Amino acid sequence: MIRGNDPILLTPGPLTTSLATKQAMLRDWGSWDAAFNTITRSLCDDLVRIVHGEGTHVCVPMQGSGTFSVEAAIANVVPRDGKVLVPQNGAYCQRILKICKVLGRASVELPIPEDQPASAALIEDALRRDPSITHVAQVHCETGAGVLNPLQDIALLCQRLGKGLIVDAMSSFGAIEIDARTMPFDALVAATGKCIEGVPGMGFVLVKKDVLEASQGNSHSLALDLHDQYVYMQKTTQWRFTPPTHVVAAFRAALDQFLEEGGQPVRGARYRRNCDTLVKGMAALGFRTFLPTAVQAPIIVTFHAPADARYDFKTFYAKVRERGYILYPGKLTQVETFRVGCIGAIDDNEMRNVVTAIGEVLREMGIEMQGRLAEAA
């Protein structure tokens, strides 16, 4: 894959992007220009099609990081007297709870171990114990540890019980199958700098038309008002406030490449090969994954840190970076870990190369894995 000489980002976003995506940012755009507004409209149409939401859902783009759009979705979809159940098995679930608190939306935390997925049975029990809950906010792929939560089961449960569902699909959209016809949701949130392989700076909410229409007046914020953003765009074809023009242009290029590659099935298969290659190679070095294979998403893998006293993450990170690879620190609360991402404009050859680099660093630091020095790959 052609990228240039930049370090490889093995993170859950920002990601390593293709040269074509980078080149798309070399042109300046007028934010009110018809050509730019055509790009925005085409993006929204394609994003809705990816989840088979034609006729039922619309796309509302939003400036800022993905968290801006998560907050916008909760603020608009959940009425001010609503109540949100948050199945919590990681750092990004915790962020949703914090958003609810700041917004003044009542919330209920459903604690789940960090190495286990949410389950429809646990969620149903929580919903039946508290009938005042109106919505469930579910992270699809919790990249704190890399757990893939069972979206379809949870979506069908919410539909059966008449509860609204907001999905944080930040790290799954474009890689894991999501079908609005069989996984009904009120709103689903993702962003440019994840599995479509764009650059950070814009999020988007795929929201049911009737839910969006009913959300007028719910938002606490002018800038994050999805209803107002959508209505204004429909009337004028323009963004309400200055859009991230270069980000939008790069996302159009990234989405074109996504579709040319074969869309979600092919993109997801590449990430799965990356993940499998990484896990196999790291196991040969003596590393253990934090998660069992059955719940591991092919997005980011959490590894137990070496038990050797000579291990120090900052030193380990710096030495791996010198070899051209940027890792991610762990986000777990109980055990020391680090994370390696499998997504971005990379393939399984890069995963083999990073395993080789990590093996070199272990030997340079004199770190023993399972009672022996790491062997050369």
From Swiss-Prot:
This is 2-aminoethylphosphonate--pyruvate transaminase. It holds the Pfam family Aminotran_5. One of its GO terms (molecular function) is 2-aminoethylphosphonate-pyruvate transaminase activity. It comes from Cupriavidus taiwanensis (strain DSM 17343 / BCRC 17206 / CCUG 44338 / CIP 107171 / LMG 19424 / R1). PANTHER family: 2-AMINOETHYLPHOSPHONATE--PYRUVATE TRANSAMINASE (PTHR42778:SF1). Gene3D superfamilies: Aspartate Aminotransferase, domain 1, Type I PLP-dependent aspartate aminotransferase-like (Major domain). One of its GO terms (biological process) is organic phosphonate catabolic process. The modification N6-(pyridoxal phosphate)lysine is found at K194. Its EC number is 2.6.1.37. SUPFAM superfamilies: PLP-dependent transferases. Homodimer. Involved in phosphonate degradation.
